[in-house]
């Protein structure tokens, strides 16, 4: 059986095992093994034709590593410092809004924002299993076509939630913080978030051709088909992109582009200085998790990256709410990206299981 057939068998079995999953994409990039393969199983959309390899989709929070990378390029250029405060970087309405919610913006730094240690409440908290009455996700479901602004989402966090804790004392995953980083990128560069990331990461040099900020940047030419993603019975294609557009998410991409990005990032092919990647992958030292149990700590989180131990090797990457998982193993030069097309998979589904299985399928090459 060829390695492509092995990958195909894996996702065929996945789609068969999880009937709620409309389809699944899998891309494996391992240049040392002469592997650059994408396979698909299932359907393009519920009731539609077969899912096509290379399809595009909303990558949601997998946008965050792009945002962090672009921000660290600004640090290398001396245009911002990780120790600058929100009060300095976001003077004006955003600073005033955060202060009105009890946030000490002169104590919250860019570093805190990039490591989810700012203490700023996540406006999308109910999307991550913290069921809150009439939360942000519920509002989106009521009016999926609403055009959100970044300021609205920050205001939601301030008015709806309370600070997780003083900056630097707790890990609290925060789309709010990522949206603030997006605002900083736009202010410093004078560009849209998508254009700033494109230039600072240097998509052209990396061969990233089908990644863009949805509705803000022009769509690239020769657009691949859309892989429809779902929240329960709702096709999120009807959701205005602004629900997740300003830094916490916002990019549309493909598995292949994501594989090229994560491989280049963790092979240190984007930054100018070796210490930059070391800073980005410096993990937290057992900080307590906001809203977690009293003894729950986080030690695998870095700057918009997470470390995972899978199949006895170390991987770095990030997940996206709508079903994207993108991880790379720099010591083996293997990058694996999957998309399973929905946010609400049943209990027992493990995102990293396919990463492990695909990695094992490379054995013997």
List the predicted regions and their residue ranges.
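Catalytic loop of the DD-peptidase/beta-lactamase superfamily, centered on the K-T-G motif
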Residues: 2-43, 63, 88, 169, ...
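Active-site helix/loop module of the DD-peptidase/beta-lactamase fold
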Residues: 6, 53, 61, 74-125, ...
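Short, charged, amphipathic alpha-helices and their helix-cap/turn boundaries
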Residues: 26, 35-39, 129-166, 191-211
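The feature captures the short pre-catalytic strand/loop hairpin that immediately precedes
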Residues: 46, 151-163, 230-242
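Flexible glycine/proline-enriched surface loops and loop-helix/loop-strand junctions
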Residues: 51-54, 161-167, 178, 238-247
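Catalytic tyrosine of NAD(P)H-dependent dehydrogenase/reductases that use a Tyr as the general acid/base
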Residues: 57-60, 171
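Short alpha-helical patches at coil-to-helix transitions and adjacent helical residues
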Residues: 62-68, 107-110, 173-178, 255-258
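A glycine-rich, coil/turn loop motif that links secondary-structure elements
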Residues: 99-107, 169-174, 250-251
């Amino acid at each position: 059986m060829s390695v492509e057939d092995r990958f195909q068998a894996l996702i065929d079995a996945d789609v068969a095992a999880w009937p709620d999953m409309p389809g699944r994409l899998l891309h494996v990039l391992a240049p040392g093994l002469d592997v650059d393969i994408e396979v698909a199983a299932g359907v393009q959309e519920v009731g539609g034709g077969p899912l096509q390899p290379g399809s595009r989709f909303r990558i949601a929070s997998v946008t965050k590593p792009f945002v962090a990378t672009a921000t660290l390029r600004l640090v290398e250029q001396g245009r911002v410092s990780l120790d600058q405060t929100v009060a300095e970087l976001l003077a004006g309405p955003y600073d005033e809004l955060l202060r009105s919610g009890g946030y000490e913006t002169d104590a919250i730094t860019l570093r805190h924002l990039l490591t989810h240690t700012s203490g700023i409440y996540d406006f999308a908290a109910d999307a991550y299993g913290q069921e809150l009455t009439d939360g942000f996700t519920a509002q989106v479901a009521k009016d999926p076509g609403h055009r959100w602004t970044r300021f609205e989402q920050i205001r939601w966090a301030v008015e709806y939630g309370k600070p997780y804790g003083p900056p630097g004392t707790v890990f609290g995953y925060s789309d709010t913080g990522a949206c603030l980083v997006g605002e900083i990128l736009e202010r410093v560069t004078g560009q849209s978030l998508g254009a700033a990331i494109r230039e600072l990461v240097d998509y052209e040099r990396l061969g990233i051709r089908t990644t863009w900020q949805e509705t803000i940047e022009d769509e690239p030419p020769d657009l691949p088909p859309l892989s429809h993603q779902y929240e329960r019975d709702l096709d999120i294609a009807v959701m205005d992109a602004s629900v997740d557009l300003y830094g916490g998410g916002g990019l549309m991409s493909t598995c292949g582009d994501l594989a090229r990005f994560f491989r280049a990032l963790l092979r240190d092919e984007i930054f100018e200085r070796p210490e930059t990647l070391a800073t980005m992958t410096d993990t937290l030292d057992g900080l307590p998790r906001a809203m977690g149990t009293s003894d729950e700590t986080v030690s695998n989180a870095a700057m918009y990256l997470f470390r995972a131990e899978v199949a006895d090797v170390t991987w770095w990457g990030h997940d996206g709410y709508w079903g994207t998982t993108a991880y790379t193993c720099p010591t083996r030069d293997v990058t694996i990206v999957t998309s399973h097309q929905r946010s609400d998979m049943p209990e027992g589904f493990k995102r990293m299981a396919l990463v492990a299985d695909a990695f094992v399928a490379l054995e013997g090459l």
